[in-house]
Amino acid sequence: MMRRSPSGLKSPRVSQGRKPRDPESLLFLRCCLGSEPHNLSSLLSPEAGQEPLPKLLPQPLAGHAAWGIHGVPTSLLLAGECWGQGMAVPADPPPASPYRTSPRPPPGPLPRYRPQQHLLLPLGRLHALCPGCPLQQSLQFERGTLSAPRLWSWMKLETIILSKLSQGQKTKHRMFSLISES
């Protein structure tokens, strides 16, 4: 349907409720999932017996400024899995006790992620090392400081997840789990 602009020229009607598909985001998601293509709707479909995530997320979610992670609180927690190689995601260390005097033991090998296990990590401290995966250097979050290309890679994928949540859908536990600290 066409409508006239103030200048008198006809312009196509633009839907306000849908966001353009980003091919780079889809490629990024396919890399995380492996070589086989997957349907986003099947990955992000609701599961029985779980609380709808949009109720747990800060509101309003759909109207945040930059259509990405901008404006979304860092209290969002996120955990991911690389289905192709098996992503190793370490849990966040417990807060240091003021009474502890012995040095912390050196970090050991990263635990391997299990599909049925929820590993919720603060967005600013997500480590993702997947041997053999081209995203090995793209998913490293250390103390909230990282280079723009690495941050942008993760923002691409998170944009898809947040868009589905804003449409009333939620993620499946085998791919992502997003909640907000209450």
From Swiss-Prot:
Disordered: annotated segments: 1-22, 89-108
Superkingdom of origin organism: Eukaryota
Compositionally biased tracts (Pro residues): 91-108
Domain DUF1725: start-end pairs: 154-167
This protein's name: Proline-rich protein, Y-linked
Protein species of origin: Homo sapiens (Human)
